[in-house]
């Protein structure tokens, strides 16, 4: 399931994030690339030991924690601490690749299974040319270029790329989520059911039928969630 989520960050949070990024130390994006990705990755990211990264991660994770749509779409069990990247000048693209199935946590404490990948845009589209996130799925190819503060989520199994940035600078945050429900089809059905229940509550209230369907949703989640 490919889904965009608007206004994950407030304008104030976005300004704070960009201010911190302006003071950050940048290194080659190859530091987090797998064997295949290293052949096509040409960008920069914030250095792991940079003093800004703790506050940047806290800001993003705090925004995700209050976002109900992010929760219902991903059903997060674990989130790899977010990374921050930059595309500009000579380090301006990331060719087609697939994300590693398992990601080592930055502190080396263990691995997280990548079920869902997410990109949070930190630059507005008019600030740069190119830089589309292009995602392939069973329905074709999708180009995504969102307003700053908005996010796209998609299955980590998807082949995707970032096209060359030919003008300006593209700042973004990317992360990987291990979902409570690893099967993407089951996760999509639960999301669609939750959205339908939300609409029913708005239209007719908490009727006995809505309560019953809510119970069915939670029973399915109970059945499909990893034990």
Curated annotation (Swiss-Prot):
SS bonds (residue pairs): none
Keywords, ordered alphabetically: Dioxygenase, Iron, Metal-binding, Oxidoreductase, Vitamin C
Co-factor requirement: Fe(2+); L-ascorbate
A Pfam cross-reference name: 2OG-FeII_Oxy_3
Tree of life domain: Bacteria
EC numbers: 1.14.11.-
Domain Fe2OG dioxygenase: 78-179
List of residues binding Fe cation: 97, 99, 160
Biological processes annotated in GO: DNA damage response; intracellular iron ion homeostasis
InterPro entries, per database record: Oxoglu/Fe-dep_dioxygenase_dom, PKHD_C, PKHD_hydroxylase, Pro_4_hyd_alph, Pro_4_hyd_alph_FE2OG_OXY
Binding of 2-oxoglutarate, residues: 170
Gene Ontology MF terms: 2-oxoglutarate-dependent dioxygenase activity; iron ion binding; L-ascorbic acid binding
Cofactor note (record): Binds 1 Fe(2+) ion per subunit.
NCBIfam families: PRK05467.1-3, PRK05467.1-4
HAMAP family membership: Hydroxyl_YbiX (MF_00657)
Classification via PANTHER family: PKHD-TYPE HYDROXYLASE YBIX
Protein name according to UniProt: PKHD-type hydroxylase NE2125
Organism, as annotated: Nitrosomonas europaea (strain ATCC 19718 / CIP 103999 / KCTC 2705 / NBRC 14298)
